[in-house]
């Protein structure tokens, strides 16, 4: 059961990455693409996929600014990405900072 679920998850990640090319996120798209296709369970991979979805949804909302369900979906995606970034910053600061640079996104606010 676990093996089937893992294969399905990897297949879905590959399909998502092919459907939404890496040119919408940051400058290191090609290297990120090959890295993230191998292991879809990595926190970095999940953040990368969420960043792709955020970019796509943001461009949709520029044209359809009254699409409130998409606005809600965007807020949910941003919250999930924020939680994953917080987890990664607590676990490994070096990986966290490298990911921020690769994806070209801002980090968490420091209090």
From Swiss-Prot:
GO terms for biological process: translation. Coiled coil: none annotated. Keywords: Chloroplast, Plastid, Ribonucleoprotein, Ribosomal protein. PROSITE patterns: RIBOSOMAL_S15. Belongs to the universal ribosomal protein uS15 family. Gene3D superfamilies: S15/NS1, RNA-binding. Pfam families: Ribosomal_S15 (PF00312). NCBIfam families: S15_bact. CDD domains: S15_NS1_EPRS_RNA-bind. InterPro entries: Ribosomal_uS15, Ribosomal_uS15_bac-type, uS15_NS1_RNA-bd_sf. This is Small ribosomal subunit protein uS15c. The keyword Cytoplasm does not apply. It comes from Staurastrum punctulatum (Green alga). Part of the 30S ribosomal subunit. One of its GO terms (molecular function) is structural constituent of ribosome. GO terms for cellular component: chloroplast; ribonucleoprotein complex; ribosome. It is found in: Plastid, Chloroplast.
């Amino acid at each position: 059961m676990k093996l089937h679920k893992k294969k399905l998850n990897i297949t879905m990640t590959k399909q998502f990455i092919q459907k939404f090319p890496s040119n919408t996120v940051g400058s290191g798209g090609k290297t990120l693409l090959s890295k993230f296709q191998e292991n879809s369970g990595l926190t970095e991979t999940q953040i990368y996929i969420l960043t792709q979805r955020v970019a796509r949804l943001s461009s949709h909302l520029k044209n359809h600014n009254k699409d409130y369900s998409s606005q809600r979906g965007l807020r949910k995606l941003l919250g999930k990405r924020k939680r994953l970034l917080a987890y990664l910053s607590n676990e490994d600061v070096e990986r966290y900072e490298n990911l921020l640079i690769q994806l070209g996104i801002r980090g968490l606010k420091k209090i």
